A protein has these predicted regions:
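Membrane-embedded transport module
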Residues: 1-145, 169-172
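C-terminal transmembrane module of polytopic membrane proteins
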Residues: 116, 120-213
C-alpha cells in the first residue's frame, strides 16, 4: 500500500544515511593514520620532513572534494536494522589504518630504492598519499570487493579530476618538485595494485574478524 511504501522508503533512506556516516568515519580515521601518523613517524625516521607545508595544503584541499562526494554517493542500504557501535567502528578503522601505514612505509622504501632526490622523494610520497587516499573511499564504501557496486558519477568525477590535477602537478613541477615519468608510473601501479587489491582483501578480512562496521 502507499503508506507502507513511504515507510519503507524512509527506512531505506535512514539506512543509506547510516552507511554514509560509517564510510565517512572509517575514511577519516584511516586518513589520520595515513597523513598524521605516517608523516610524523617517517619524518622522525628519516630526520627530515617527508612532506612540505605546500604538499600538505594541496593534499588536504584536493581530498575535500572526494570526501564531500560521500554525501551524494549511491550506497546499498543494509537489509537488516543496524546499530551504532563506536567501539567496533574504531577497532575496524584502526586495523585498516595500520594496513595503510604498512603500505605507505613500503612505498617509502621503494622510493629510497629508486634513488630519488630528497625533493623528488617528497613529491613521490605526496603522489602516493593522495592517490591512495582517493581510492580508499572506493574500498570503504563497499563491504565486499570494491567493484561490487558502482560509485556515484560525482564521486568518480571528483576522484578523476583530483588524480589528474595531482599527476599534472608532479609531472610538470607546478608549485612542487617534478617527478620523472617512470616514478609517476610506478606510483600509479603501486597505488592501484596495493590500494584497490591489498587494502580491499585486508578490509574483507577485518570485517570477517569484527563483523561489518
Amino acid at each position: 500500500s502507499p503508506g507502507l511504501r513511504e515507510i519503507a522508503d524512509i527506512i531505506r533512506l535512514g539506512r543509506t544515511t547510516y552507511r554514509k556516516i560509517v564510510v565517512w568515519t572509517i575514511n577519516k580515521i584511516v586518513k589520520t593514520f595515513s597523513i598524521v601518523y605516517f608523516v610524523a613517524a617517517s619524518t622522525l625516521l628519516l630526520g627530515i620532513p617527508i612532506l612540505t607545508p605546500t604538499h600538505m595544503i594541496l593534499m588536504l584541499f584536493l581530498y575535500d572534494f572526494v570526501t564531500l562526494s560521500i554525501s551524494i554517493d549511491v550506497l546499498r542500504p543494509s537489509e537488516r536494522p543496524e546499530r551504532w557501535n563506536m567501539r567496533k567502528l574504531v577497532a575496524i578503522s584502526t586495523m585498516l589504518g595500520v594496513v595503510k601505514l604498512t603500505e605507505l612505509f613500503a612505498a617509502l622504501y621503494i622510493a629510497k630504492l629508486i634513488n630519488l632526490s630528497y625533493p623528488q622523494l617528497q613529491s613521490f610520497m605526496f603522489h602516493i598519499l593522495l592517490l591512495s587516499g582517493l581510492l580508499n573511499i572506493l574500498n570503504f564504501r563497499e563491504a565486499g570487493m570494491f567493484w561490487n557496486s558502482r560509485p556515484s558519477n560525482y564521486m568518480l568525477l571528483a576522484i578523476t579530476i583530483d588524480g589528474i590535477v595531482a599527476t599534472t602537478l608532479v609531472w610538470r613541477g607546478i608549485i612542487i618538485p617534478a617527478l620523472p615519468l617512470y616514478a609517476i608510473a610506478l606510483a600509479f601501479i603501486y597505488v592501484i595494485a596495493v590500494t584497490l587489491l591489498v587494502t580491499d582483501v585486508a578490509k574483507i578480512a577485518v570485517y570477517r574478524l569484527f563483523g561489518r562496521a
